[in-house]
Amino acid sequence: MDNPSEPVVVDQNDAPCFEHTVESVDLRTIPIPHHWPQDRGRYSSASIIIAQDNGIRNVSFHRQFLRDENHLVVRLVPRHLRTMVTNARGEGREVSVAVVNAPDPVVLLAAAMSFNENIDELTIAAALHEKLYGRPLGLVEMPNGVHVPADAEYVWWGRITLEDDDEGPYVDITGTVDDVRKEPVIEIDGLTPVSYTHLRAHETLGNL
């Protein structure tokens, strides 16, 4: 944390995550699992959300319920992204986001960290990337302006809207059934398609 590093931005033509794009969004065609019978439906549980708003970037884990072909309902716990969304909504604004699946493990590690201040987790991931691989972490800009790891397997971009909807029930990492809450809705505007998820026991998340 004392020695963050700046990622480098690469062109879309040099970004593996842009090797394939789809013309129309239908998240129902993506292999998003229905983990447990008690769950509300299909959930993306190992994706990270990268949000950018007012010059601040946040990278963090948040589960997302697949509501329909281009909407997710995201469980936001009271940390930095929740604060970012609350502040934006207070001004009547949506928040630009990208849902990222299967980036390099250093990005997953940085996203799992919690800080007491607004630290850009991608600068932590970039420092780890340089330490491990001897080269900078590459980012690419999505059509909505959000920068994501260029080598991620799957990226969806869109907006956290002003709408809330039911999220849950969901079998959480503790094995208990989480409550139903009103949570923000993400509208997905595009995606670049290999999807990654935590299996039922959530071992990966538990180890983080």
Give the residues covered by each predicted segment:
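Extended, highly charged
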Residues: 1-170, 175-185, 189-203
